[in-house]
Amino acid sequence: MLAKLFGLSKKQQSASVAKERLQIIVAHQRSELHPRSSKISSHLLAELKDEIIEVVKKYVALSEENIRDIDLKVEDSSKNSTIEVNIPFN
């Protein structure tokens, strides 16, 4: 009824709903990168760290101490998010 009042067709309504849902999904996916946002994001960062370690080990010898000291930091700005990785090695 409101759609008829404001002149919106069903197609326009569904497009609007789809756009809103997509915006929610994108915001949720972006928030998963932030370590304080949820337990899932901590898990994501842990997986990322493990994969980075495996790649670096192909090219550089890493001791257990080096691996323990690897640091991942997520920084958010108004334009983008960055992940900074510090890997000590001998």
UniProtKB/Swiss-Prot annotation:
One of its GO terms (biological process) is cell division. SUPFAM superfamilies: Cell division protein MinE topological specificity domain (SSF55229). Coiled coil: none annotated. Pfam families: MinE (PF03776). Keywords: Cell cycle, Cell division. NCBIfam families: minE, PRK00296.1. Prevents the cell division inhibition by proteins MinC and MinD at internal division sites while permitting inhibition at polar sites. This ensures cell division at the proper site by restricting the formation of a division septum at the midpoint of the long axis of the cell. Belongs to the MinE family. This is Cell division topological specificity factor. It comes from Francisella tularensis subsp. holarctica (strain LVS). The gene is minE.
